[in-house]
A protein has these predicted regions:
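Amphipathic alpha-helical segments at domain termini/boundaries
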Residues: 1-20, 110, 114, 159-179
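Hydrophobic, secondary-structure "cap" segments at the distal end of domains
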Residues: 142-152
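Glycine- (often His-adjacent) and acidic-residue-rich active-site loop
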Residues: 35, 49, 56-88, 104, ...
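Conserved CoA-thioester-binding segment of acyl-CoA-metabolizing enzymes
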Residues: 1-58, 72-73, 87
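Terminal peptide-recognition signature
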Residues: 19, 36-37, 55, 67, ...
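Glycine-rich beta-to-alpha active-site loop
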Residues: 59-60, 89-133, 137-138, 162
């Protein structure tokens, strides 16, 4: 396993790149996480020995949203922003899988939606809670969620900020498999 940065690790097993984020307590989408994921995906996409990419997170949860302690901190702007990361993942020619446990909220769900396939444990929960903070999903979540689940379900998730469980996420098409 190779350390991309202090919160992102990279390994290749049997042609599958495994990108792991570990930023306790909730794997918030911090500057370090965004940059680490970008560089790990860049590495996997440039490696001819890699046929697919899996994104997993250590700890108790997947990516639980933006790192709100840095939301207004101009000094905490990443060299690579979340849109560049999402575009890099979404336009990849290699298959990619988000392996979700715990919660995938806000920016974390937006990252998960950029991967081609999403699997989750039965206890996983999903949501776009930005409305509860007086915000709108800002990382492409409004468009991607609508494409995945349809306008009615997407609007409900975005306007209520309520979380849904893995069974409902699977039923509406947000995730592809419960494992």
């Amino acid at each position: 396993m190779t350390q991309i940065n202090p919160v992102t690790h990279y390994a290749v097993e049997d042609g599958i790149a495994i990108v792991t984020t570990n930023y306790p307590p909730v794997n918030a989408l911090s500057v370090e996480v965004i940059e680490g994921l970008f560089h790990a995906f860049d590495r996997a996409l440039g490696d001819a020995a890699v046929n697919a990419i899996v994104l997993i997170c250590d700890g108790r949860t997947f990516i639980a949203g933006a790192d709100i302690k840095n939301i207004n901190n101009a000094q905490a702007r990443p060299q690579v922003d979340a849109f560049e990361l999402q575009n890099r993942i979404e336009t990849s020619a290699k298959p990619s899988v988000a392996a979700i446990h715990g919660t995938a909220l806000g920016g974390g769900l937006e990252v998960a939606m950029t991967l081609g396939y999403r699997v989750a444990v039965p206890s996983a929960r999903f949501g776009l809670p930005e409305v509860k903070l007086g915000l709108l999903p800002g990382g492409g979540g409004t468009q991607r969620l609508t494409r995945l689940v349809g306008a009615r379900e997407a609007l409900d998730m975005m306007t209520t900020g309520q979380m849904i469980d893995a069974a409902q996420a699977h039923r509406i098409g947000l995730i592809d498999e419960i494992v």
